[in-house]
């Protein structure tokens, strides 16, 4: 139980379509309609390729997207299909190459170096995308908050959590986030005034033991909802008096950087 009165509705399950594309279109349509109604959808289960359908909802809304993915891998394998269909290890290519392009920025949180090839890292650097290695953030999960703060949508792969805490995944491994770190990431996502959808993917109950992963996912959702109901509403910027502006010049460039800090939250 939380300290606030919540308004939550279980809309049931989206059944798999005859083709994968049918499932994508169903998810895309539902997510887009809910966002139009100012309702934040929480997607549970399914492969992480559903992230692509979640992203397509913003195309329907003609809205630029800042996408954050919590994952131990970069799911950028070559996708040879020219249709809407993809899979859980190639969906990012589908998003990056999608036309028209509504992707404003992409960030990965928690990648593990031995799962990522150097070509993928070079692609991230070339596109000016953010990628934070697990070793950089483990034990200092608060470093994820500035990245999550700008996200419009978030995709959380359960395999990014260590197998001892979340074994209900075909790709579960010995390393990853601790359960409490995953919950903190979800709380940060809930705090984000800009976030309008979130998905938790790759949960497979066939691999679960004593419902432990299901319990952890429930706690992650609880933390997200708790964060949502504690939003400070300091985005977008309404009154200049509510913010402190810092300006700095770059010595080698003729550009000025402007930082804006909320007096309400110190963010």
Predicted feature descriptions by range:
Residues 1-200, 204-267:
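Conserved alpha-helical scaffold segments that buttress catalytic/binding sites
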